[in-house]
A protein has these predicted regions:
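Intrinsically disordered, low-complexity segments enriched in small/polar residues
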Residues: 18-172
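Bacterial N-terminal signal peptides
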Residues: 6-16
Length: 172
């Protein structure tokens, strides 16, 4: 019995440590998938970086010590830049529901939208409780929000999906 308890304790400790040392992309949407991809600022950009689609109600975590997750090798107190968007949940709906970008206009690159999150934090996609379905979706009436949070769940920034000043999503 004692070896089993030791194994369970070790597994629990490993799981707890994994979450505290990773950033996570959380999808709190019930009917949409989300996609986040790390944007490397150093050139040349690495051949492979974090780029994941997360299903509705799921999350995906990545350890920033992994070069794919943190190509700029930012320290624990730094931030990571992402391309982020809300997508249709399945392939058939993708034509009816085009992706909705999340974030703020990138000052370094025209026509690009980025979201910034702590290296040891979270990106959480969620429905906007203040969305008015009677109005056209857009930067002033976003159907979705993307929140950047610290490891202890403090909101750092809230981004609209779509962002202010970026072309609006079609009404579906």
């Amino acid at each position: 019995m004692r070896p089993v308890l030791n194994i369970l304790f070790a597994l629990g400790a490993a799981l707890a440590a994994a979450d505290s040392h990773a950033y996570c992309v959380r999808n709190a949407l019930a009917d949409r998938a989300v996609h986040a991809a790390v944007v490397a600022s150093k050139m040349p950009a690495p051949a492979k970086t974090f780029s994941e689609t997360v299903a509705a109600g799921k999350e995906f975590c990545c350890n920033p010590k992994n070069a794919d997750c943190n190509p700029d090798r930012a320290g624990d107190a730094a931030t990571v830049v992402f391309d982020a968007q809300v997508e249709a949940a399945d392939a058939q709906a993708k034509t009816a529901q085009p992706p909705v970008k999340c974030g703020a206009p990138d000052p370094k690159e025209q026509n690009r939208v980025v979201a910034i999150a702590p290296v040891r934090g979270f990106l959480r996609f969620e429905a906007n409780a203040r969305f008015d379905a009677r109005r056209r979706p857009g930067g002033d009436n976003p159907p979705f929000l993307l929140k950047a949070l610290t490891a202890d769940n403090k909101v750092v920034t809230t981004y609209s999906c779509p962002p202010h000043g970026v072309s609006e999503t079609p009404h579906s």
